[in-house]
């Protein structure tokens, strides 16, 4: 039988390649006569390293170049960290598969001199590195005595900056640390009570052409239904709020007794205003769960906070 050839578009960062190689390996294991190749490239978000992510904007910052490859027929699928994939995709493309989720939580990584501290016991003025406005707003809300500083670069670069003494600690996604073999550097998993994670964090999203039935059938072998239900609810929540991955919006989701539990948070940039609530709904209608939670937060003033943030972005 003739091999079916499938080309994957991927970012060329170490983490992206680890994730893409995992997808390649799993597809080839599960689909007989499948030949998978990878086209690695840099995205805008990979190239601009001297500006805070929030100031660049986030419309396809880490995805646009990969999507262009699919739209011109140079790639069949693109593998993304789902948290980087915008909730509104270009015409002709769709989120075809969501893989089983790694731990979605944020993690504290500390310098050697600070390994006796947890996040809640760090001395006043400690320098905490994060590039995420979501983490920044929540941690400012809980720990206003700490000094937060922007940090850019890939996971390895950030750890090197920490070890060089630029920061006392940094906050990273636990999933990325584990996938890159840095699990031993996880000093503390940050509880949801302190910091809700990003939408889709810990899961991989496989994007493809909307009308490519053969490719959709192939990638469906990697679909994890519970992860998909949770992440679709999270993404619907984010979409309904018209937020992006660089806005202070956090979530947590779980499935209990055939019900989908979704907690969501919106905060001001300074962390002084933080709105958090939960919605419990039908596991088979995750989109509705996300929309209903967004409505609850809007009624409490979330849309006012977000419009102020967008106005600040426009001014800057």
From Swiss-Prot:
PROSITE patterns per UniProt: PORPHOBILINOGEN_DEAM
Q: Which domain of life is it from?
A: Bacteria
Q: Which SUPFAM superfamilies match?
A: Periplasmic binding protein-like II, Porphobilinogen deaminase (hydroxymethylbilane synthase), C-terminal domain
As for family, the record states: Belongs to the HMBS family.
Entry GO terms, CC: cytoplasm
**Purpose of the protein:** Tetrapolymerization of the monopyrrole PBG into the hydroxymethylbilane pre-uroporphyrinogen in several discrete steps.
Give the protein name, as stated in the record: Porphobilinogen deaminase
CDD domains associated with the record: PBP2_HuPBGD_like
**More info:** The porphobilinogen subunits are added to the dipyrromethane group.
Q: Is Transferase one of the keywords UniProt gives this record? A: yes
* GO MF entries: hydroxymethylbilane synthase activity
Ordered alphabetically, the record's keywords are: Chlorophyll biosynthesis, Porphyrin biosynthesis, Transferase
- Biological processes annotated in GO: chlorophyll biosynthetic process; protoporphyrinogen IX biosynthetic process
Cofactors:
dipyrromethane
